A protein has these predicted regions:
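Conserved C-terminal helix/linker of AAA+ ATPases
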Residues: 1-19, 62-66
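Helix-rich C-terminal "collar"/helical-bundle subdomain used as an assembly and partner-interaction module
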Residues: 18-99
Length: 99
């Protein structure tokens, strides 16, 4: 299984794995990764924002920020935060260029 201690800290290796799936537009793998992780959505949004510069093209950063802000806000009202977070990752996969 997945080491939840590593995911709570949203390690670089966990992020790299997720980013790899997103770069490949592998929706199924992203969904599986998210389902197996127990990362807190608020923690995720912050960590993804902090580490995104290393993985997202500069020209895509404004779009990334807009997606993260929108879904971070919606998270407060989401009946199922995992679905909300998956929607966020799906939009980022569709709209952002990965390095």
């Amino acid at each position: 299984g997945i080491d939840t201690g590593i995911l709570r800290n949203f390690s670089d290796s966990a992020l790299a794995k997720l980013i790899g799936y997103m770069k490949d537009k592998n929706f199924t793998a992203v969904r599986k990764w998210l389902g197996e992780s127990d990362i807190e959505p608020t923690e995720f949004f912050r960590a993804f924002f902090d580490k995104a510069e290393d993985h997202i093209a500069k020209g895509s950063m404004p779009q990334l920020v807009l997606h993260l802000a929108k879904y971070q806000y919606q998270n407060a009202f989401a009946a199922d935060p995992e679905i909300n977070l998956m929607a966020c990752l799906t939009e980022i996969m569709a709209d952002c260029e990965f390095l």
